């Protein structure tokens, strides 16, 4: 297996694996080039382009005895590793057997080299455009198809097939497909009640339902014709990559793909402290840090909380606070990360949000000043008591803002008596005892 694209650990990336089909041993070097071009083409199209950093890509080089693929309609048969074939009736459709001679081989290779693969792509070395979704399990595309969607060209067959595999998007074709199950997908529906349409959050109140084609491009509505039916089935927009080659995904399909990415990848790549449950017993400042997986064109939103209360201005990747600002006992420090992309309007499972919470048990020394005594000569004394194993500092202030140290000492049997050294009248003075940081 050869790495094509690395953006981070495979445990938190959407891992693409491209497998060679119809490449002889002498053509495997070209396969790596073709696989790289295929990945770059796919990730150049929205919404993948915005989330390119969320992907890794790899190539598995498997030699075939012969180059190309079967074309039964032309009487051409090739001896290839995955036994791919163009459909005899629809020569744009490429499939591999679902048994151990095709799909089983793909599964075995992925299990050996990349068990955490979320998007397998079988790249067929054939100039005739074609592909399929491998019955929902993988994207299959020919080199002839991929060459037509490299930048600056628009999305094509490969991009279309990944919509099936990643987001379970449906075909928006209107030509009949006998026996195709009448199951709705994220972008197809039979529903005509405006209030019940699954993508209603994208539909403007002044858009007619059903929506006439005269409304034009870029308007989300309810356009008749989808799911291999001319009538009775509806799609979100007039044109979309799930119905036409050479056009981008519509808003609803783009949303479904972004949600599909976040089903597999979390926005928080790492955090510090690594332990989310710890104790503190000193005043040393605590710093919490996030490592985020940022999209290409916008940044994720961050908000820090202490005990459920949002901290004003705490929106950076790190957050520092003093344990003194927390109560003794159990406290919770949380960071909420949101992707506020305009590509998603409906996220019922909150996939675009992640919260990291640290449970911090605070046991800071508790000091008290009490039992003031008036002494002769204008002096006085008071007692410091409580718990301060690392010692304490007595400080004084005339305004409660500026504090000056007077004495550093330790408690003996839980207490200490302080006597002021100044004789005679003195200005009003405030005193406190604090533990060192």
Please identify what each model-predicted range represents.
Residues 361-437:
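Short, composition-biased motifs enriched in small/polar/acidic residues
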Residues 13, 285, 299-303, 379, ...:
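Exposed beta-strand and adjacent loop surfaces of beta-rich binding modules
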């Amino acid at each position: 297996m050869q790495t094509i694209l690395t953006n981070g650990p495979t445990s938190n990336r959407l891992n693409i694996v491209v497998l060679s089909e119809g490449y002889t041993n002498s053509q495997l070097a070209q396969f790596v080039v073709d696989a790289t071009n295929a990945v770059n083409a796919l990730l150049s199209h929205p919404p993948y382009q915005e989330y390119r950093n969320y992907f890794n890509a790899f190539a598995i080089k498997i030699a075939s005895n012969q180059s190309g693929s079967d074309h039964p309609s032309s009487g051409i048969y090739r001896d290839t590793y995955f036994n791919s074939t163009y459909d005899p009736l629809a020569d744009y459709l490429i499939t591999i057997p679902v048994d151990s001679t095709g799909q089983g081989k793909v599964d075995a290779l992925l299990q050996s080299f990349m068990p955490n693969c979320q998007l397998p792509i079988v790249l067929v070395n054939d100039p005739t455009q074609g592909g399929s979704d491998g019955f929902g399990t993988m994207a299959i595309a020919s080199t002839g198809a991929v060459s037509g969607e490299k930048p600056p060209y628009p999305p094509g067959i490969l991009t279309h097939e990944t919509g099936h595999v990643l987001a379970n998007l449906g075909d928006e074709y209107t030509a009949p497909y006998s026996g195709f199950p009448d199951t709705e997908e994220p972008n197809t529906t039979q529903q005509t009640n405006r209030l019940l349409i699954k993508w209603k959050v994208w539909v403007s109140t002044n858009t007619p339902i059903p929506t006439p084609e005269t409304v034009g491009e870029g308007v989300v509505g309810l356009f008749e014709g989808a799911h291999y039916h001319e009538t009775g089935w509806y799609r979100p927009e007039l044109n979309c990559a799930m119905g036409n080659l050479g056009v981008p995904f519509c808003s609803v399909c783009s949303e479904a793909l972004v949600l599909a990415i976040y089903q597999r990848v979390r926005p928080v790549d790492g955090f510090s402290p690594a332990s989310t449950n710890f104790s503190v017993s000193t005043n040393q400042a605590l710093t919490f840090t996030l490592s985020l997986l940022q999209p290409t064109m916008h940044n994720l939103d961050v908000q820090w909380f202490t005990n459920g209360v949002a901290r004003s201005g705490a929106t950076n990747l790190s957050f520092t606070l003093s344990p003194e600002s927390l109560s003794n006992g159990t406290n919770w420090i949380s960071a909420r990360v949101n992707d506020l992309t305009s590509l998603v309007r409906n996220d019922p499972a909150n996939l675009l949000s992640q919260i990291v919470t640290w449970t911090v048990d605070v046991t800071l020394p508790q000091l008290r000043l009490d039992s003031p005594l008036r002494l002769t000569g204008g002096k006085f004394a008071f007692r410091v008591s409580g718990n301060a194993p690392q010692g304490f500092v007595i400080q004084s202030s005339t305004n409660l803002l500026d504090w000056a140290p007077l004495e550093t000492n330790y408690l003996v049997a839980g207490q200490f008596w302080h006597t002021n050294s100044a004789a005679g009248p003195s200005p009003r003075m405030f005193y406190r005892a604090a533990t060192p940081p």
